[in-house]
């Protein structure tokens, strides 16, 4: 398997940001209203801090179809960390880059550590770095 995989960029829309904010039941108006966000000094509607998780589905689909030989029914989510360089805003065009940081066996299981970096399509700057730890259980 390639250790670094680039995915197509995705445009972040106000609609998706507001939909996600409603789904996680946040009350902060900067996640629901462009006017509230701009009056708070932001350039536009702000993404809820966990919004980066919307890219995880695409990453998991790739991992399952890769040569890592993973059965989706055996994956357990270990942990996930978000390191923001700046907030995600409506209008951003973000390109995810996946790196497999670790793939090690222990007992009848594996630990796979993924790093997903969201790059700004315009500046190529890091916006968010997510570290995702998956545990792949062995067959019973």
Curated annotation (Swiss-Prot):
Pfam families: FAS1_DH_region (PF13452)
Disulfide bonds: none
Cross-referenced CDD domains: R_hydratase_like (cd03441)
Gene3D superfamilies from the UniProt entry: Hotdog Thioesterase
HAMAP family: UPF0336
Family: Belongs to the UPF0336 family.
Name of protein: UPF0336 protein TWT_721
């Amino acid at each position: 398997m390639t250790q670094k995989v680039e995915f197509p960029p995705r445009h972040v829309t106000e609609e998706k940001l507001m939909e996600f904010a409603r789904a996680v039941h946040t009350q902060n108006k900067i996640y629901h209203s462009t006017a509230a966000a701009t009056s708070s000094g932001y350039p536009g509607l702000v993404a809820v801090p966990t919004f980066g998780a919307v890219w995880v589905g695409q990453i998991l689909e790739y991992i399952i179809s890769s040569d890592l030989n993973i059965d989706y029914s055996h994956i357990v989510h270990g942990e996930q960390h978000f390191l923001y360089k700046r907030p995600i805003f409506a209008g951003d065009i973000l390109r995810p880059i996946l790196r497999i940081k670790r793939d090690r066996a222990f007992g009848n299981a594996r630990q796979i550590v993924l790093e997903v970096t969201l790059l700004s399509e315009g500046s190529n700057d890091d916006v968010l770095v997510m570290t995702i730890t998956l545990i792949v259980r062995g067959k019973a």
